[in-house]
């Protein structure tokens, strides 16, 4: 009898414990995503704890390119949670900017090179497969981001460049047409009338500060190398070199990132910037998140800031801090530049950092916006006093 009583009490005890555990599970709050505001100069972050349902799906892009974000968000919402739409959203969003000639720094008719021609760079990266499709120095084809998608989907290559990229585009059904407009021609004519100032040449003769060339190499003593690194001749600024960089994430944490640009104004023909370079202009990894960059591509591409930001998030840094780390690596070596980074983790937390401007605007669409899902946000950039004591990463 005592044995049966002990057994019954033991069963009741186990049942009570199990019930308590289940009750605790069922009544515990829904997990939230830590995303506290960062007080560091030049960074911004999601300012309140949000659940996954409130953050995803999402679209985020550089600058106040609203129409591109609105279209990408509309496409993402065509399926529940944005599933299987992230690539479409990024490509069509960037394509919208190409058609609108956003700030004259994306798409045709902007940033003429030294010969007066506009060329295009673009990239698409799949965070699930790590596959990339990119084009650089694309001539006579308006749909750069869509050609990049064809490189991704129809070749085993990562990037095609120049006239060969244009021939590939023709083979894929894209039509050739001039990328020069009356506005871009006038920009070029005015530049040449002002002795081609400013330009990107150095260590050549005749003096590139007062002439248009043609130039020949000028021997440079080793003692001049440090001096020649200065970039005072050509200031890259807000209206000189904007890139649309866009990230889309669905509710299953599938990520695509993309970029499109017409490059630096009055660039030397053949120049390619950071936008089509994986890890520089953009980087995406479903296991971690994604980042996109904009600014002085000649400087930024040397440091792969988008990759650095993603790897910082992999190491546990929140997106805002990860974005700042990407810029700090550059600042350790080069302080005369302008640039910005957006970083987003796989759960939809995001942050941005910038340098060389007063502030950096970017567009976000997500459920967190409630009755205003598409919104413009800004981050104040690292100020002059913050330029010192940059730590090595």
UniProtKB/Swiss-Prot annotation:
Residues 1-23 form the signal peptide. Cleaved into an alpha and beta chain by autocatalysis; this activates the enzyme. The N-terminal residue of the beta subunit is responsible for the nucleophile hydrolase activity. GO terms for molecular function: N4-(beta-N-acetylglucosaminyl)-L-asparaginase activity; peptidase activity. CDD domains: Glycosylasparaginase. Substrate binds at residues 271-274, 294-297. The active site is at residue 243. It comes from the Eukaryota. Its EC number is 3.5.1.26. One of its GO terms (cellular component) is lysosome. Keywords: Autocatalytic cleavage, Disulfide bond, Hydrolase, Protease, Signal. It catalyses: N(4)-(beta-N-acetyl-D-glucosaminyl)-L-asparagine + H2O = N-acetyl-beta-D-glucosaminylamine + L-aspartate + H(+). It is an enzyme of class 3 (hydrolase). One of its GO terms (biological process) is proteolysis. Disulfide bonds join 97-102, 196-212, 354-381. Heterotetramer of two alpha and two beta chains arranged as a dimer of alpha/beta heterodimers. Belongs to the Ntn-hydrolase family. Cleaves the GlcNAc-Asn bond which joins oligosaccharides to the peptide of asparagine-linked glycoproteins. This is Putative N(4)-(beta-N-acetylglucosaminyl)-L-asparaginase GM21137. It comes from Drosophila sechellia (Fruit fly). The lineage of its organism: Eukaryota, Metazoa, Ecdysozoa, Arthropoda, Hexapoda.
